[in-house]
From Swiss-Prot:
The lineage of its organism: Bacteria, Pseudomonadati, Pseudomonadota, Betaproteobacteria, Burkholderiales. Zn(2+) binds at residues 333, 384, 510. It catalyses: tRNA(Thr) + L-threonine + ATP = L-threonyl-tRNA(Thr) + AMP + diphosphate + H(+). Catalyzes the attachment of threonine to tRNA(Thr) in a two-step reaction: L-threonine is first activated by ATP to form Thr-AMP and then transferred to the acceptor end of tRNA(Thr). Also edits incorrectly charged L-seryl-tRNA(Thr). This is Threonine--tRNA ligase. One of its GO terms (biological process) is threonyl-tRNA aminoacylation. Its EC number is 6.1.1.3. Pfam families: HGTP_anticodon, TGS, tRNA-synt_2b, tRNA_SAD.
């Protein structure tokens, strides 16, 4: 007798072992038809999985997030099936699920073209309509490797040969195609109805640039056509908002091959940067942080003591001078500990909050670089709080409130919070972890925030809160973190004198709100589509003269506004006013101030707001008041 507990708490009993599909059928024909897989005692399995013991089971359908993952994984295999049918000489490698879709890497003697993608997608549709059953069999490692070598699939054989001999190997087949995979997969190809191939890109075998170059075909798959249409529309919008395009269009920054992963900020882009940095500086100062500055290059011995040299060296830029090894800092924390250690600290000094707009460098792979979003040189709005264990909750509450307020000010209202909990391998006692995790929970609760818990995802030295902001297109970006660290103060010898005169280690809270300034600016540019709020805009207004006779008035007006602390320029070129208006409209300037003879004589301005809104003619003082009101409403 096998007893199976369902999500509603009911228990079904079966005389003999049953498959997930059979359980679904016993519940109802509709569920049997909709079943894509099952969650057996928390593990995702195929509908063909046999249950021979008492267990809990949830039937997975296309209404579940896991169901969509199964569909995408199976569509990646369908892609490989179609490619092998159309291009038998192509060799298959790997095909995982990624955000919003999947990809599959192929080795082929010529590049795949857009026309090839159309043919492949059409063949995928034909194969899906055949509704061929997807079957699974478990074989030994040697049998699997031998099979793939016999059909000339050297990459698959190499993957299998790297797997421990004792491991079971799963092979999935549909039609004439067999692939190595951990699964699970849909029960038949007819479940795959909504998909599209997106693009081809280069990739290296096993992600190593020393290996052969492969071709990576990206695709997307969904349960409903409306969802796919919405996603494709979002991609169109994202392309229009691409910060790399807007950076060029708005003359904010550029990047070039002579300095890969580093940013050349232009005057307007640097003005935007300064607004963000000055705002963040004001907020951390108000929150009781002390701003410091630490060296960019430090001796190897410090990085060895912190553990970075042993565990992070390949991502660090290193140099040598006078027979000493140095590294450019990839992060600011070891330097902050040195400031804390400089002098005797008392419990009365705690909490001690150090902030730094710290310039860091990481040796990211060139293929991973992506505009401002993934760079090698970046500045973090970094800070470290040194406190006692009893102060963790209060400091976490204060940080949560600060972070949420900052995100709102920048126009982000939807924040997802995730709490990463203890991993299996960790330092510290269970009691210490209990207190640390519960402290972070209490801090989130005190702020009225909801969160998702991620068991096992914390660092080995402490739990962590992550802040994921959603932009105007619904995309999620992780920006802020609050990481509790029980290790670094010990490794680097940080201590304070407790109330009983004993020496104790402080708890260290690593925290950032925007994270990488470069990346955050990229997110801001895309979120606002380059049309920055007035308080952030590099140029808040441009004065445009219609003819030569208004040049002096236009210059005087711009200077008057600049003296009020406003970011205003004058465009005095001998061009048609319609041309100048169009140009500055494309630059997304919040206000255009047009002056002709009438405005000059009356000491007024004709004001056009962003979006082509005509605000009419008004005295200069009235416009200044309007702009100041925009700024006051933000503050």
């Amino acid at each position: 007798m096998v007893s199976i507990r369902l999500p509603d708490g009911s228990v079904r009993q079966y005389e003999h072992p049953v498959t997930v599909a059979e359980v679904a059928a016993s519940i109802g024909p509709g569920l049997a038809k909709a079943a894509l897989g099952g969650k057996l005692d928390g593990e995702l399995v195929d509908t063909s999985a046999v249950i021979d013991h008492d267990a809990s089971l949830a039937i997975v359908t296309d209404k579940d997030p896991d169901g969509l993952d199964i569909i995408r994984h199976s569509t990646a295999h369908l892609l490989a099936y179609a490619v092998k049918e159309l291009y038998p000489d192509a060799q298959v490698t790997i095909g995982p699920v990624i955000d919003n879709g999947f990809y599959y890497d192929f080795a082929y003697h010529r590049p795949f073209t857009p026309e090839d993608l159309e043919k492949i997608e059409k063949r995928m549709q034909e194969l899906a309509k055949k509704d061929e059953p997807v079957t699974r069999r478990v074989v030994s490692r040697d049998e699997a490797a031998g099979y793939f070598r016999s059909i000339g699939e050297k990459y698959k054989a190499e993957i299998i040969e790297s797997i421990p001999e004792s491991d079971e190997i799963k092979l999935y087949s549909h039609g004439g195609f067999t692939d190595l995979c951990r699964g699970p997969h849909v029960p038949s190809t007819g479940k795959l109805k909504v998909f599209k191939l997106m693009k081809v890109a280069g990739a290296y075998w096993r992600g190593d640039s020393k290996n052969e170059q492969l071709q990576r075909i990206y695709g997307t798959a969904w349960t409903k056509k409306e969802d796919q249409d919405q996603y494709l529309h979002m991609l169109e919008e994202a392309e229009k908002r691409d910060h790399r395009k807007l950076g060029k269009q708005l003359d904010l920054f550029h990047m070039q091959e002579e300095s890969p992963g580093m940013v050349f900020w232009h005057p307007k882009g640097w003005a935007l940067w300064q607004q963000v940095e000055q705002y963040m500086r004001r907020r951390v100062n108000e929150a009781g942080y002390l701003e410091i500055k630490t060296p960019m290059i430090m001796d190897r011995s410090l990085w060895e003591a912190s553990g970075h040299w042993q565990n992070y060296r390949e991502n660090m830029f290193t140099t040598e001078s006078e027979k000493r090894d140095y590294a450019i800092k990839p992060m600011n924390c070891p330097g902050h500990v040195q400031v804390f250690k400089h002098g005797l600290r008392s419990y009365r000094d705690l909490p001690l909050r150090y902030a730094e707009f710290g310039s860091c460098h990481r040796n990211e792979a060139s293929g991973a670089l992506h505009g401002l979003m993934r760079v090698r040189g970046f500045v973090q709005d970094d800070a470290h709080i040194f406190c006692t264990e009893e102060q963790i909750i209060a400091e976490s509450i204060a940080f949560n409130k600060l972070a949420m307020s900052v995100y709102r000010d920048f126009g982000f209202d939807h924040i997802d919070i995730k709490l990463s909990l203890r991993p299996e391998q960790r330092m510290g006692s269970d009691e210490t972890w209990d207190r640390a995790e519960q402290g972070l929970r209490e801090a989130l609760t005190a702020c009225g925030l909801q969160w998702e818990e991620l068991p096992g995802e914390g660092a080995f030295y402490g739990p962590k809160i992550e802040y994921h902001i959603k932009d105007a297109l619904g995309r999620s970006w992780q920006c802020g973190t609050l990481q509790l660290d029980m290790m670094l103060p010990e490794r680097l010898g940080a201590e304070y004198v407790a109330e009983d005169n004993s020496r104790r280690r402080p708890v260290m809270l690593h925290r950032a709100i925007v994270g990488s300034m470069e990346r955050f600016l990229g997110i801001l540019i895309e979120h606002h589509a380059g049309a920055m709020p007035v308080w952030l805009a590099p140029v808040q207004a441009v004065v445009l003269n219609i003819a030569e006779s208004q040049v002096e008035y236009a210059q005087s007006l711009a200077q008057t506004l600049q003296k009020q602390g406003l970011r205003v320029t004058a465009d005095l070129r001998n061009e048609k006013i319609s041309y100048k208006i169009r140009e500055h409209t494309l630059e997304k300037v919040p206000y255009l101030l047009v002056v002709g003879d009438k405005e000059r004589d009356a000491q007024t301005v004709a004001v056009r707001a962003r979006g082509g809104v005509d605000l009419g003619v008004m005295p200069v003082e009235a416009f200044v008041e309007r702009l100041q009101e925009d700024l006051r409403s933000f503050k």
